Amino acid sequence: MIYIGLPQWSHPKWVRLGITSLEEYARHFNCVEGNTTLYALPKPEVVLRWREQTTDDFRFCFKFPATISHQAALRHCDDLVTEFLTRMSPLAPRIGKYWLQLPATFGPRELPALWHFLDSLPGEFTYGVEVRHPQFFAKGEEEQTLNRGLHQRGVNRVILDSRPVHAARPHSEAIRDAQRKKPKVPVHAVLTAKNPLIRFIGSDDMTQNRELFQVWLQKLAQWHQTTTPYLFLHTPDIAQAPELVHTLWEDLRKTLPEIGAVPAIPQQSSLF
């Protein structure tokens, strides 16, 4: 099994594609990044609505709130974690992964706090950790310690591939904004648990995106034999994300025939 989705389930320009709601999005994709929870907890009635708009084969990958990962730096936040997991509990059967997106200031010295935090989480869910501190990408003892600790706990290291967006010409505000915000870190395709998560940050150059994605075809084919990967496809202007799906899908299907036909959404050319 492989899960493929986008960083969000709605965008104003997707309305013209027929994607007007989470329910409609879920007809085309089997998972989604849950970025909204990084910034604020959804109201209980909103969580219930999300449950109503999806089925049990759909997967949400929600981020832990920034109040936990950034402000508290994983310390003395048991109440915040309980509040978050309780709020999201109606979606429990559809949680693909809860993941920590840690700031670049969270370095090797903070690893004891990470281990304590992960060890305190309920065992019923799958977890991921996305790091941004340079030493975790230096292939030294610090990175080895991180990977070893995640592996021992069965926690996935989230993989960010931002090569395409940082290789793009900065000819639009969307590109420039993405280049400012998306970390420019080495791509370390490390498998630490059974649900690897890849965030592929494309550019607006679909030919270049396809070229840079080729390395993932072999990796996904390999990982797919023993794990359940998640793949999220980004573009600087999220309106173009469905176009990236169309660009990469045929290559993905040749590698992973089980994904079936490309999602039946129109091409993006009419939007730009």
Predicted features along the sequence, with ranges:
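Residues lining hydrophobic/aromatic ligand-binding pockets adjacent to catalytic sites
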Residues: 1-272
